[in-house]
């Protein structure tokens, strides 16, 4: 091998080494789940999935449809409308869920919930029997009958009934605000626009869960949500989400 070829070969190895050294930390960082965020400019199929073709049953009076999850004007919108695809329910809802699971850390969302009696707009973490794990869940839920309030809740091994309703002092459906929860081994602290408004310290969930958002109408839960009047279409809007391991 002549000197020129040796120099070219060495240069190629140096470039390859630089690229590997540059890319590996980024990949490792992403896989470590230390930070995750999405500005919802478009669908990201590597990170998220649209629920499609099934119903949760029970109090969920809708079938999830991928067509009810859309990305427009730099945000994601979930739609509630009449189901035209012959499902087992009269309505179609939108649900978006992360492909990966996440554990202790700070979860944040900027969103505008839908406003109408009988419906729920949500941001939450979930794992359960469908994932071959106990049912653990942490919720931020807006009951469309009164979007000047937000409801916080959590489930540990399927046990819930920890509802707490916080009076926001504004109508959440009219503009984007940031809602969050900091989940740690010994507590969960919910925040609104960066200010802690509720904290719990008993029977804290421990299993990693998927980040989820959905919009759905209720049935048989009028005492909680109010009676759904069938109004469609309705939309909940999500500007961005983030997770930071803490």
For each feature predicted by the language model, list its residue ranges:
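Bacterial N-terminal signal peptides that target proteins for export
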Residues: 2-14
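Sec-dependent signal peptide cleavage junction
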Residues: 20-32
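GH16 jelly-roll
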Residues: 29-246
């Amino acid at each position: 091998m002549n000197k020129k070829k040796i120099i070219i070969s060495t240069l190629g190895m140096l470039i390859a080494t630089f690229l590997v050294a540059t890319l590996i930390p980024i990949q490792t960082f992403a896989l470590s789940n230390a930070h995750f965020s999405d500005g919802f400019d478009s669908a990201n199929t590597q990170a998220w999935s649209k629920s499609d073709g099934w119903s949760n049953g029970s109090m969920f009076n809708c079938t999830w449809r991928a067509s009810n999850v859309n990305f427009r004007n730099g945000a994601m919108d979930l739609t509630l409308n009449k189901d035209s695809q012959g499902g087992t329910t009269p309505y179609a809802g939108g649900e978006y869920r992360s492909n990966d699971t996440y554990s202790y850390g700070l979860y944040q969302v900027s969103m505008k919930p839908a406003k109408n009696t009988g419906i729920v707009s949500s941001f939450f973490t979930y794992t359960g029997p469908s994932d071959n794990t106990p049912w653990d869940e942490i919720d931020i839920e807006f009951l469309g009958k009164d979007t000047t309030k937000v409801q916080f809740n959590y489930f540990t091994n399927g046990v819930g009934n920890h509802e707490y309703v916080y009076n926001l002092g504004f109508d959440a459906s009219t503009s984007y605000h940031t809602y969050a929860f900091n989940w740690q081994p010994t507590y969960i602290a919910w925040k609104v626009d960066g200010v802690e408004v509720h904290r719990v310290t008993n029977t804290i969930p421990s299993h990693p869960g998927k980040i989820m958002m959905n919009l759905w109408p209720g049935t048989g839960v009028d005492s909680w949500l109010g009676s759904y009047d069938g109004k469609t279409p309705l939309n909940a809007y999500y500007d961005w989400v983030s997770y930071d391991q803490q």
